[in-house]
């Protein structure tokens, strides 16, 4: 497969790998950590601009794409990358300690968020969706204060509970359609199940947005 075919996989995977690398960079080399975070978020923004122009995109192209970019996900991906770059640059002024952990978690959050918005498979969506609250918890607890720890635990409990609703909603979708591929779902709005699935996923989405 050529670069263009694998483009979506790189856009999701590179920030996650770069974030893992930041975790092992010594604190004395915080300039390297910051430079890496800036470069990755800048490249991510450029990549999502390209994705927005080239949409629709699929990866892998056959038989069932794991990632799909349409108009909505392209716009969401562009916004995620833009704000990741803004947060990264803004953080240079106030993050003094734990640079490796902070920017590592931030980059992994970027990759996981892009993975969630581009995911076509609902199982893949749940995986990326579940990683995000864990990273949020780790970012908040970097402040190492009692208040921060308590807030992080409350957010994690709320998100964890509502994520169970999302999984239940996805289970209902699978029961109705027999597939986890979103582009292959054709749902008739008959009976209670479609509306129950919608409400479960909607509540989980609002809970995650509120926590973030």
What do these predicted regions represent?
Residues 1-104, 176-188:
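Transmembrane helix-loop-helix hairpins at membrane boundaries of multipass inner-membrane proteins
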